[in-house]
Amino acid sequence: PDLPTRMEIDGAPLDPVQGLVLMLNKPLGMTCSHKEEGALVYDILPDRWRRRDPAISTIGRLDKQTTGLLLLTDDGDLLHRVISPKRHVAKVYRAGLARPLTGTEGALFASGELVLEGEDKPLAPAVLEVVSPTEALLTVTEGRYHQVRRMFAAAGNHVETLHREQLGGLVLPADLAPGQWRLATADEVASIFTAPESVG
């Protein structure tokens, strides 16, 4: 059965059992790595949760300037299933661009032939959905370093804002404000491994 999404005793969150999955709306300016300077996403969690064993870790990362859906878990098997290249879990990003789209980006990103600067292996095909002249949704199935930003750079543009809206079929809940988190239900976790629907 699903766990309640939030349990409290005297107003303080109760420690959930092992195998928890948290959905966080990552705010701007927070990092996912202890190796970087600045506020960590883990700082949002109750202090004692950060001392759990096994430790809570992010499932993949979002860079400091990227906002949106970030999952955290103490389930190592789930973590590796989600980030495994064999799973092809899709990630949907909303990108705000410095310059209007030219109309050529969709074919370039879908070609499976785009090679990012400094790399040898082409990117897997990605799907571009135009929202406005300077805004687009991009669905990718890989997690290369700063991939979305570098893809638009390869197309002659610059990403000014980047927000992850979906991971597989799991959509960032509309009622989860930046910096807020809650426990994911079993159905929500299962939806990670389904195909995303259009969120435009």
Where are the language model's segments positioned?
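Basic, flexible Lys/Arg- and Gly-enriched helix-loop patches that mediate nucleic-acid binding at interfaces
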Residues: 1-200
